[in-house]
Regions:
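Long, contiguous binding/interaction regions
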Residues: 1-122
Length: 122
């Protein structure tokens, strides 16, 4: 099953990219090698009903469910994971996909994160 993905507002994408650049700069400062694929988590705020739709769509892009949490204000968060590099092109594509999922499912994309990968052996 393939989805017709909605176009993303370029101003919103640019705003997200500013936040993404800060995350990438922090990773680089910690010795990250961006081309190394690793688990990357993304989160969405919404309702349990919305999350079921998110899972159906996101699974088509290789995301798996990590966790669901409720914060102190009662907001529900869904955490998903995929494995990918974190170079600029990969993160721009990830953010675009997440914003499209946000639009299709009525949830709020809350960002992404990962651990720095230096290429060293532990």
């Amino acid at each position: 099953m393939s989805q017709n993905l909605p176009p993303v507002d370029e101003a919103r994408l640019a705003a997200e990219w500013e936040a993404d650049r800060q995350v990438l700069a922090n990773l680089a400062a910690n010795g990250d090698v961006a081309r190394i694929a690793r688990p990357v988590d993304v989160s969405f705020r919404g309702s349990e009903q919305d999350f079921e739709r998110v899972l159906i769509i996101a699974s088509q892009f290789g995301f798996v469910e990590l966790d669901r949490e409720e914060d102190e204000d009662g907001d529900l968060f869904l955490f998903l994971e995929c494995v990918q590099p974190v170079d600029e092109q990969s993160i721009r594509a990830l953010t675009r996909k997440c914003l499209q999922i946000e639009m299709m499912c009525g949830v709020e994309y809350d960002g992404w994160g990962c651990e720095a990968q230096t290429g060293g052996v532990h």
